[in-house]
């Protein structure tokens, strides 16, 4: 499935010295998002910073949303993850995409202009409504919570 999403360039470096979001491989699920800053930025241990991407998107289709996810290598090797863990982009949002970057390590981390810092994945959305009931139809699990369906 392929869908076209509107993208607005907010900084003239996008598409020039800083590439547009792109899939790294044919099998990539996420588009790489890059930092749109003018000079290197130090992120101190345990510090959270909000990084601009220089782009805005408009999904428009209410049956589609996007999530901003961390890049696995940055998290595993450098302790760089998203400050909000996952960023949700609603279909009607039109503002700049920004990345909440949290350095959970004990070392300073340098973010350079154009660095790939997160990834954008588009996901289907099902909007629902609720039916208020007094009792649920019985299920095999019932009210079993944490750990009730197996060891892990």
Swiss-Prot record:
Needed cofactors: Mg(2+)
Keyword Metal-binding: yes
Pfam family, one: dUTPase
UniProtKB keywords: Hydrolase, Magnesium, Metal-binding, Nucleotide metabolism
Annotated EC: 3.6.1.23
Molecular-function GO term, any one: dUTP diphosphatase activity
Binding locations of substrate: 71-73, 84, 88-90, 98
Reaction(s) the record says it catalyses: dUTP + H2O = dUMP + diphosphate + H(+)
GO BP terms: dUMP biosynthetic process; dUTP catabolic process
Pathway membership: Pyrimidine metabolism; dUMP biosynthesis; dUMP from dCTP (dUTP route): step 2/2
The organism's place on the tree of life at top rank: Bacteria
Described purpose of this protein according to its UniProt entry: This enzyme is involved in nucleotide metabolism: it produces dUMP, the immediate precursor of thymidine nucleotides and it decreases the intracellular concentration of dUTP so that uracil cannot be incorporated into DNA.
HAMAP family: dUTPase_bact
PANTHER family hit by this protein: DEOXYURIDINE 5'-TRIPHOSPHATE NUCLEOTIDOHYDROLASE
Family per record: Belongs to the dUTPase family.
Protein name, UniProt field: Deoxyuridine 5'-triphosphate nucleotidohydrolase
Species annotation: Legionella pneumophila (strain Paris)
Lineage of the organism: Bacteria, Pseudomonadati, Pseudomonadota, Gammaproteobacteria, Legionellales
């Amino acid at each position: 499935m392929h869908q076209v999403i509107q993208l607005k360039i907010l900084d003239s470096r996008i598409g020039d010295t800083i590439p547009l979001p792109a899939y790294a491989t044919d099998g990539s699920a996420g588009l790489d998002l890059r930092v749109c800053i003018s000079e290197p930025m130090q992120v101190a241990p345990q510090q959270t910073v909000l990084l601009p991407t220089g782009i805005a998107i408009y999904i428009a289709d209410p049956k589609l949303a996007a999530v901003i996810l961390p890049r696995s290598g940055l998290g595993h090797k450098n302790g760089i993850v998203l400050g909000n863990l996952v960023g949700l982009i609603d279909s009607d949002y039109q503002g700049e995409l920004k990345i909440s970057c949290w350095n959970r390590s004990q070392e300073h981390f340098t973010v350079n202009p154009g660095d790939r810092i997160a990834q954008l994945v588009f996901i289907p959305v099902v909007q629902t409504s609720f039916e208020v009931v007094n009792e649920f139809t019985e299920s095999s699990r019932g009210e079993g919570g944490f750990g009730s369906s197996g060891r892990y």
